[in-house]
Structure formats: structure tokens, C-alpha cells
């Protein structure tokens, strides 16, 4: 499965003055995927604690600071 390399490259061009190598773009994308996976896993646990079957926005909001702190660079 491929990922949107052009979109990531465009994002970095808009927000940074430097270009990135292809391997750096790969690492950024993998870190992003790991972040989303962790966020959804913790939100799912939070939903189970409250007895919900689906993950609601409030479950994500309640754990977002914890996950963001883990991924702070």
C-alpha cells in the first residue's frame, strides 16, 4: 500500500524552508501512523470504560493530551 508522498512533501514545503529526503518523509509518515494507532487504541479503551460500543469525540478529547505528550518531539 502506498501513501500520499506528494501530499506530505507539499505540506513540508508550505511549512518549512528546507527540503526533505525520501527516507525522512517515510519516517514522518510512519510516526504519524503510529500516533493515530495509539490515539485510537486509547480512545477505544476509554470508550469501553464508559460502556460505549463506539468511540465518540469526547473519548478522543479525554486522552489527547496524554497521547500528544508521548509523541512530543
UniProtKB/Swiss-Prot annotation:
Task: State if Nucleus is listed as a keyword.
Answer: yes
InterPro entries for this protein:
CBFA_NFYB_domain (IPR003958), CENP-W/WIP1 (IPR052484), Histone-fold (IPR009072)
Q: Which GO terms describe its molecular function?
A: protein heterodimerization activity
Transmembrane spans? none
- Please give the Pfam families that the UniProt record associates with this protein: CBFD_NFYB_HMF
GO terms in the biological process aspect are: chromosome segregation; kinetochore assembly; mitotic cell cycle; mitotic sister chromatid segregation
Q: Which UniProt keywords apply?
A: Centromere, Chromosome, Kinetochore, Nucleus
Q: List the disulfide bonds.
A: none
Q: Which domain of life is it from?
A: Eukaryota
Task: Report the subcellular localization.
Answer: Nucleus; Chromosome, Centromere, Kinetochore
Q: Without the gene, what phenotype results?
A: Severely perturbed cell division. Aberrant cell-wall deposits accumulate during septation alongside a range of mitotic defects including errors in chromosome segregation and spindle formation. Slow growth at 25 degrees and inviable at 32 degrees.
Q: What is its main location?
A: nucleus
Oligomeric state and interaction partners are given as:
Component of the inner kinetochore constitutive centromere-associated network (CCAN) (also known as central kinetochore Sim4 complex in fission yeast), which is composed of at least cnl2, cnp3, cnp20, fta1, fta2, fta3, fta4, fta6, fta7, mal2, mhf1, mhf2, mis6, mis15, mis17, sim4 and wip1.
User: What is the purpose of this protein?
Assistant: Component of the kinetochore, a multiprotein complex that assembles on centromeric DNA and attaches chromosomes to spindle microtubules, mediating chromosome segregation and sister chromatid segregation during meiosis and mitosis. Component of the inner kinetochore constitutive centromere-associated network (CCAN), which serves as a structural platform for outer kinetochore assembly.
- Could you say which protein family the record assigns here? Belongs to the CENP-W/WIP1 family.
- Protein name as it appears in the record: Inner kinetochore subunit wip1
| UniProt organism field | Schizosaccharomyces pombe (strain 972 / ATCC 24843)
The coding gene here is wip1
